[in-house]
UniProtKB/Swiss-Prot annotation:
This is Probable prefoldin subunit 6. Belongs to the prefoldin subunit beta family. Keywords: Chaperone, Cytoplasm. InterPro entries: PFD_beta-like, Prefoldin. It is found in: Cytoplasm.
Amino acid sequence: MADMAKFEEEISKLKTLEKDREKYFSSRQEMEMRLTESKNVKAELDLMDSDSKVYKLMGPVLVRQDLEEARSTVEKRLEFIESEIKRVEASITDVNKKSIEQRDKVMNMQKAFQMMATQAQQQAAQKK
């Protein structure tokens, strides 16, 4: 019975890793959307003349912002998002590796249980 408890614990670890992977994929997808949006904003700002007026939404109010400041802010946001994507991708790689290892561990335990069950059946058949 202790073996079965250990098996269930290992399955639980695998499920946790799979949930983590889903969370990281979702996070990466969200960051990709932010990256695309920020690239579009940067492209729009790059098309503007130096005397163009730029407004920034702060709560319910539009506030005038310097064009160079807006470009700088968007550039920093792009750098931040790209670094976050790299961090999440590293986490995805790590959790994928751990998931594969955990899946192998669970499969090996399952095979061992099946072999024990087969041996028990064979021994029971021999006793008859």
